[in-house]
Amino acid sequence: MAREKFERNKPHVNIGTIGHVDHGKTTLTAAITNVLAKKGQAEVQNYADIDGAPEERERGITINTAHVEYETETRHYAHVDCPGHADYVKNMITGAAQMDGAILVCAATDGPMAQTKEHILLAKQVGVPALVVALNKCDMVDDEEIIELVEMEIRELLSSYDFPGDDIPVVQVSGLKAIEGEAEWEAKIEELMAAVDSSIPEPEREVDKPFLMAVEDVFSITGRGTVATGRIERGIVKVGEEIEIVGIKDTRKTTVTGVEMFRKLLDEGMAGDNVGLLLRGIQKEDIERGMVLVKPGSITPHTKFEGQVYVLKKEEGGRHTPFFAGYRPQFYIRTTDVTGQITAFTAEDGSNVEMVMPGDNIQMTGELICPVAIEQGMRFAIREGGRTIGAGVVSKIIE
């Protein structure tokens, strides 16, 4: 019986709950599954199931994340919830759990707190496109005016981080009362999910985006030419199409004369495929790991960018000691290490930071020694002698 309802005939959207510790993110997640389960659109997950999330490792970083899934009338959702603040930081920066949108949970009893702000900033930096606010614990506040003040405060806060604070839906909920089955609060969860359905845009499918493949390896095939292999990150490439080779050296154009997968010839390769592309008029020495093959004009190489970085703790295999501006690590971007320099560290309020400790979450400005294809929202690792010491996401391209 329960098996039938998860047919994949609805658009799939990835979301998560974010917000300050103890504001009720996990309880709200449980409440959503409880309310939707009554309509046969979810399996009930209780607080303990979600809170006891197993550890996962993403690029060597340990993250606790709970994954639940449910449906509304129009969509299928995968929802992530993390037990601890550090897990959110790591999750959002590494992109371990991609979010097309998020439910910002804020307790009406407390209003916005330190991590409320930090999570909004993180959402902005890592490119979470849309938020919906769940004003939680509203059953505990008798005075409607207090709730209105908290709502105003949240809207101003969102606007200060360049989210559309005036337009974002704010829904008054009580996760606990909804789980206990009180009808008015169950209705509020449905209202929240209706807001999520309408305010969080459906993500563009990878296959509809402009073609990009990072080069992993290059071969010469006698009598046929040069083949670049890799996994197509997005888009579609067809035999006979013109593409650009971008990064490290000057950008140049070529034509794809063959697409091969598992030794078979194809007419086209699409997002997710591991392929070899035969390139016209290209010598083996013209192309190397770390370059990308792209739809012409869709991406340009850059050397200078801002990033949001999580610095690994020593228990995670990171550094044991702090480092300072001027530090020269390797930036691992897509398929290769590029030497660069971290020229500045910036705190949340925009002030300069001298020293960065293992375990910190920080904004940095980086400069690479050669131009590579980087873009906003792209993930990278910071490495030193082959081991990862930081994980980051590009928040802004400078030049």
Curated annotation (Swiss-Prot):
Keywords: Cytoplasm, Elongation factor, GTP-binding, Hydrolase, Magnesium, Metal-binding, Nucleotide-binding, Protein biosynthesis. Residues 174-176 are annotated as: G5. GO terms for cellular component: cytosol. Its EC number is 3.6.5.3. One of its GO terms (molecular function) is GTP binding. Mg(2+) binds at residue 26. This is Elongation factor Tu. It comes from Synechococcus sp. (strain CC9605).
